[in-house]
From Swiss-Prot:
Gene Ontology molecular function terms on file: basal RNA polymerase II transcription machinery binding
Gene Ontology terms: biological process: dendrite extension; positive regulation of dendritic spine development
Protein name: Protein LLP homolog
Stretches the record annotates as Disordered: 1-22, 53-126
Lineage: Eukaryota, Metazoa, Chordata, Craniata, Vertebrata
Cited InterPro entries: LLPH-like
Broad class of the protein's primary localization: nucleus
Organism from which the protein derives: Danio rerio (Zebrafish)
Family: Belongs to the learning-associated protein family.
Localization, UniProt: Nucleus, Nucleolus; Chromosome
Function: Regulates dendritic and spine growth and synaptic transmission.
GO cellular component, one term: nucleolus
Amino acid sequence: MAKSLRSKWRRKMRAEKRKKVAPKELARLKSALGQGEKGEISMKDVAEIATVVPPEKVKQKPADVDMQEEEADGGKMDLDTKRNKKTMLDEHGRYPVWMNQRQAKKLKAKRVGKNGKPKPKKRLAW
């Protein structure tokens, strides 16, 4: 799909704005890290710029260790919902969240169409 003039213009303007704001943002980051004029770091300033994670969460097991344990358990995911593989519907009659709405509508029409009116039997034409 071709890029519209509007999207190109907006991208260009965002890039110019980034250039304009970059020195100020750099100064904020440096001051938050304590490399600026003051040597102290206030957590309020850091929280404005970045997400603050408590040290307990950082000290927990790394994610790769968790993956190794899951593989050792059998490698199967634990699913809360049961899904019909053919129709992709769960037990409540809903399609998965990742499915496109058009695709869900198409599958529903196909499913409902099968249970519609029966076709008349073919007869001999006299």
